[in-house]
Amino acid sequence: SNKQLNFLQHIYRSLKNNGKARAAVVLPDNVLFADGDGEKIRRDLLDKCNLHTILRLPTGIFYAQGVKTNVLFFTRGKTDKGNTKEVWIYDLRNDMPSFGKTNPLKPEHFDDFIACYADGDLSKRKETYSEENPNGRWRKFSIQDILARDKTSLDITWMKTESDTDNYTFAELLDQIKEKSQNIAKAVSELEQLIGEVEE
């Protein structure tokens, strides 16, 4: 929603541009892929800050069951342009058990991420993803990869599991249908406009 996007924008713009001020923010998935203002804010964040890490959290641990969240780790640059060179993403969501009251998320579930994170020292990081290990949870994407994505989406997945299609709640499926319907309606509207111009 706009509130969440504004919240993110407020945080990174409030950081001192000294190359040291940093933040880690928990945000729902839609902030990673919302179009319009969402894309503008993501591009601004990638410019003004070094968005070096995204941790994809298991479903339903912060909000209502079914809501997907992420932690964005970033450092404000000294300039306002070109601060992000690469984004490292750790997928703690795919192929993980469902967490809740009966199966709480524990500190040890973060052990591998903490080791991969390497205290934020990018030079010490090593991907666990490779062509030989396509389900490695830790993967690096260049800024060119990110900017080339539709709407500069940061909602990136690569791990494939047999249960991928079974993990959606009814509400999530409705959200997906709604989003796809909006995209289709927009495309139809643009097509109608184009046809109208041709016929004129």
Q: What is each stretch, according to the model?
A:
Residues 1-200:
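A conserved structural/catalytic subdomain of Rossmann-like adenosyl-cofactor enzymes
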